[in-house]
Amino acid sequence: VDYIEHVTDEFREIYDIVKHTKPYTGLKVAILNAWGRLRTWQAHMVAHELPYKQIYSYLGIMEALSGASVDVSFISFDDIINDGVPEGVDVIINAGDAGTSFSGGEVWKNETLITRIREFVYNGGGFVGVGEPTAVHHQGRFFQLGDILGVEREMGYSLSTDKYFTKELKEHFIIEDIEDVHKIDFGENIKNVYGLTSATEVLEFSNPKVSAGGVEEGIVLPANAEGKEFGEIHLAANPYGKGRGVYIAGLPYTPENTRLLMRALFYAANKESELTKWYASNPLVEVHAYPEKGVYAIVNNTNELQSTLVYDGAGVSRTVELEPSEIRWEKIS
């Protein structure tokens, strides 16, 4: 009874503060699929709260964005074909398995669609693809916007073509918070993804194998007789004109994957310096600011004590200690 009283009081406090106002957001992100606004905040199937092998690798995107300091909209392929990329969008996300309404399937043969997205990115926008984005067999390509993402998927038609670009970058903005990139959870993974050019920034390259304990770990197998590595890219970035593309093989929900996605979005948008505004260095802690109300909340998402650097709207940090599950409200100075 005491705990229920605590939770309801906490809810009332949150509602009294956030009603009739909007939180600070550092980016405007558009999720691109066939549905657009018709399925706003609806995931890859109806019973999405259940663990399905075919969709869990994408559910972390929605979960991460729902609590992130980004303004999210949902747009359809027809929206872009008819009207172009909406004004103000910083980054487009296209995520899903090939042939689904979420990835797009045959629509990626539409030249108006791919031309307008290329123009958007070339002029400074960002494009993040997860799983099999922009995927359809057409004109010798599978990922139709592989030139933006910097990667392509080998489908058996170019096995004799050497795949040279396998060397991982040891330092990069996207993986700055990650101790071991080979322990990132990419879910079901996408096989046989390779780098297209030397400009592709390979951030994770491995051949996932299941260990004796049943835990999938990224392992690069020994080179074969020709010196090639048996593996594939699961995380990469790529420059495209003034903009950037980012490829992620899959994104199940974890606090670490939430941080990975945020870094990928800010990197794709060329707004790395904006990340550390109303931000916590600890991925288990969130910061939500409400400038119109002059307050911000620091949230401990765990049942354990947490310590973190908290950054204000000017990017100035200080150390904060939080009790388990604590929500701490403070005034914006």
What are these regions, as identified by a protein language model?
Residues 41, 157, 162-241, 252-259, ...:
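Catalytic beta-strand/loop cores that center a nucleophilic Ser/Cys/Thr
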Residues 1, 46-52, 94-109, 251:
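The substrate-binding groove and active-site-proximal loops of carbohydrate-active enzymes
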Residues 64-84:
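A short, well-structured beta->alpha microelement
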Residues 319-333:
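C-terminal beta-strand-rich structural cap/linker in extracellular carbohydrate-active enzymes
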Residues 85-92:
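Short acidic/histidine-rich motifs immediately flanking catalytic phosphotransfer sites
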Residues 1-60, 157-161, 184-189, 222-226, ...:
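Hydrophobic targeting/anchoring helices
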Residues 130-131, 204, 248:
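Generic beta-sheet signal
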Residues 104-187:
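A glycine-rich, often tryptophan-bearing local segment used as a flexible ligand/cofactor-contacting loop or short
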